[in-house]
Amino acid sequence: MASHSLNTLHTVFEYIWDRELPNDDFTNTLTVLGRTYAPGPPPHQEKAPDLRTLFHKFKPDQAADTEASWPREFLRDVHSRIWLTYRSGFPLIKRAEDGPSPLSFGSLIRGTVDLATVTKGFTTDAGWGCMIRTSQSLLANSLLQLRLGRGWRYDQTRECAKHAEIVSWFVDIPTAPFSIHNFVEQGANCAGKKPGEWFGPSAAARSIQVLCEANYDKTGLKVYFTASGDIYEDELFELAQQGAELRPVLILAGIRLGVKNVNPLYWDFLKKTLGWPQSVGIAGGRPSSSHYFFGFQGDYLFYLDPHVPQKALLIASEAPHESPDPNHYVEVESGLDLDSVHTNKIRKLHLDQMDPSMLVGLLVENRASYDALKHSINSHDQGSRFLNVYDSRPVLAAKSSGGLEESEFVDLGVLSMNEYDAIDDCDVGTCSALLRKERAFSHPVLVAMDPEEPEEIDASIHFDKDASILEKDPDRANETFEEIHVSETESRFEPDEPVVVSHDSAAVM
């Protein structure tokens, strides 16, 4: 009886969540990853839906009417995007001893929990894997564009071997190059994430970076990650240049465009990034959850929602049968359910509802593509953009580090450390773009020790005129600075590549 009630409740939630979204904007152009579509003429006025249909499945003619309100070519483009979602029933991901429990109220409601394995680990990512799934979607669509071109369209009646191969790299088994198992493993290695813990943009980006490098022979794709939004040409070229040409490289920018919401100052530039031909979408951008954003209309962003539990995407493992881990093997069908990674359901979110923490993806296929991207970035007003291109990292020389190790960083120019205290769900390494305009510097700075210095040095902290004052009352000036221990900075910040800042202001502008 209880099981039947849960299934009924799950069906109701699924119906409400899965309802078609009609087009109600016939003025603004539709944009999908660099392609634009006319909104089309408004349909005839329709009656409001009967609320009595709430507990009934959507009728085919109703779905057709909703679908008809969107331009056909726009729908074909959306339907061709690879859509990776929650899955259940995949090979076990072992639980960490001090990690989250696979059993939760949400998993019971969704009906995705496997009670037979719940004490051992996870066989579903429902409730915690949305950032992984949207990052997989971003990467999968990058590979789709790289191998099949932006004009390719999914056709259910025709089999495309390259498309099927790309999807097979993301199936839910440990041996697939970009499976959730490998993302979880790299999340632990790169960001200390335990199975069942929610990823942020930085953990997702670093996982993509490591996995793409490990599987470069398959993908032919390099990954450049910036946690500040700043792209340094010398580093990018060192990573991807081959002679006079540039090999394909995926630029990932882990950024935060506000404290609780996206600052309206960045709205225009955010939409422009989705309109560039190099755009492969945005992962993140919803409080305590993540979506894959692929386009916009007016001030609304279109997205694919990963919060739709489906049966695990499985194909036969290529691992040798003498593998010591029996969890690598499950009973699977020989075919690949390609239809389950595509949808034509349209969802959109207003920019003022978007979470400011996100991962922006840009695919550079060659040198001409990079030059065009650089021009697009530089043509926008610097005060309202969150991406910048520099020849190289600026340099700051220091006589002593006061005992800092080479891997430790000091962040200069933050208005108040309390800005970071307010960001509970901020992923490590993604906060450096916060309040860029009010900061003396926008990057973590590596301060190197001068080997010529004597052993006894002044290790005290000295503040310059740009140092942040936490107390505005001048009478309490002696209480205005907080002491920040190294252990605290390590727990709050995950350093990106070392950044050095020059006294020459022209180098940073």
Swiss-Prot record:
Q: Which Pfam families match?
A: Peptidase_C54
> Chief location of this protein?
cytoplasm
Q: Does the keyword Hydrolase apply?
A: yes
- Which Gene Ontology terms cover its molecular function? cysteine-type endopeptidase activity; protein-phosphatidylethanolamide deconjugating activity
What keywords are assigned to this protein? Answer: Autophagy, Cytoplasm, Hydrolase, Nucleus, Protease, Protein transport, Thiol protease, Transport
Any single Gene Ontology cellular-component annotation: nucleus
Q: Subcellular location, in the record's words?
A: Cytoplasm; Nucleus; Preautophagosomal structure
Q: What is its EC number?
A: 3.4.22.-
Protein origin, superkingdom: Eukaryota
| InterPro entries assigned to the protein according to its UniProt record, in alphabetical order | Papain-like_cys_pep_sf, Peptidase_C54, Peptidase_C54_cat
Q: Where is the active site?
A: 130, 305, 307
Q: What reaction is this protein's catalytic activity? A: [protein]-C-terminal L-amino acid-glycyl-phosphatidylethanolamide + H2O = [protein]-C-terminal L-amino acid-glycine + a 1,2-diacyl-sn-glycero-3-phosphoethanolamine
Top enzyme class? hydrolase
A Gene Ontology biological process term? autophagosome assembly
**Family membership noted in the UniProt record:** Belongs to the peptidase C54 family.
Function recorded in the entry: Cysteine protease that plays a key role in cytoplasm to vacuole transport (Cvt) and autophagy by mediating both proteolytic activation and delipidation of ATG8. Required for selective autophagic degradation of the nucleus (nucleophagy) as well as for mitophagy which contributes to regulate mitochondrial quantity and quality by eliminating the mitochondria to a basal level to fulfill cellular energy requirements and preventing excess ROS production. The protease activity is required for proteolytic activation of ATG8: cleaves the C-terminal amino acid of ATG8 to reveal a C-terminal glycine.
What is this protein identified as?
Probable cysteine protease ATG4
Please name the source species. Pichia angusta
> Which gene name does the record give?
ATG4
